[in-house]
């Protein structure tokens, strides 16, 4: 029986890397995969899933009004049967689109692997993540670390000076220049441990790199 999987994590946990590796594993065995990425993510070339380690793959860029169940049916008519559907940045899905993913698994018997953030910079659930947590068959946490070495579970938004931002719109597309993953303790303290050129972390206790 096909299942809906939600792989969630904080920023920079390698979600896109794991997605691309999973797709490669299917294709290496002669199976077809369908990749989706939200059009709202403008960090990279349109319709491309990119990882921080340099991997990339073409994907179907969807908007929040697209019906992913219908799209999958239509795209499958143009190709052989898909063995897996993979969604990048799944936190941007709408409630309706998460329901459509359940239809892909339940009606088409295709496993769906969704990868995304659990919470925003305010520590609140994204709509897509909320319903994936509620409806997915399997929940898998991908782990990354805070600058202190603890597991990072929070996403801190930072300004150009590396200071924590606590107000603003939920969605602000950005990478390492805008966000940093931290543990809950340093999230509450507003201490980002900002990475500077050369990948050296500034130690706020000793004022040294």
Curated annotation (Swiss-Prot):
Subcellular location(s) of the protein: Cytoplasm
BP GO annotations: DNA biosynthetic process; thymidine metabolic process
Binding site for Zn(2+): 146, 148, 183, 186
Subcellular location, principal: cytoplasm
Enzyme class: transferase
Residues holding ATP: 9-16, 88-91
Family annotation (PROSITE patterns): TK_CELLULAR_TYPE
EC number: 2.7.1.21
GO molecular function, one term: thymidine kinase activity
Active site positions, chain numbering: 89
One Gene Ontology cellular component annotation held by this UniProt entry: cytosol
Superkingdom, natural source: Bacteria
Keywords: ATP-binding, Cytoplasm, DNA synthesis, Kinase, Metal-binding, Nucleotide-binding, Transferase, Zinc
Catalytic activity from the UniProt record: thymidine + ATP = dTMP + ADP + H(+)
Subunit-structure text: Homotetramer.
HAMAP family per UniProt: Thymidine_kinase
Family: Belongs to the thymidine kinase family.
Name recorded for this polypeptide: Thymidine kinase
């Amino acid at each position: 029986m096909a299942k809906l999987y939600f792989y969630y994590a904080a920023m920079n946990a390698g979600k896109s890397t794991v997605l691309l590796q999973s797709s490669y594993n299917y294709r290496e065995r002669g199976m077809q995969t369908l990749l989706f990425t939200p059009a709202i993510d403008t960090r990279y070339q349109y319709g491309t899933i990119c990882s921080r380690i340099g991997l990339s793959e073409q994907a179907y860029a969807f908007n929040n009004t697209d019906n992913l169940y219908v799209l999958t049916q239509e795209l499958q008519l143009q190709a052989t049967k898909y063995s897996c559907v993979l969604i990048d940045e799944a936190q941007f899905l709408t409630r309706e689109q998460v329901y459509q993913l359940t239809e892909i698994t339940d009606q088409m018997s295709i496993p769906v692997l969704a990868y995304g953030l659990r919470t925003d910079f305010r520590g609140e659930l994204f709509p897509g993540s909320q319903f994936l947590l509620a409806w997915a068959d399997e929940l898998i946490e991908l782990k990354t670390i805070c600058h202190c070495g603890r597991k990072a579970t929070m996403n801190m938004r930072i300004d150009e000076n590396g200071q924590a931002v606590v107000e603003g719109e939920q969605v602000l597309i950005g990478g390492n220049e805008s966000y940093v993953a931290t543990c809950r303790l340093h999230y509450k303290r507003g201490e980002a441990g900002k990475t500077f050129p050369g990948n050296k972390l500034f130690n706020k206790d000793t004022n040294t790199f």
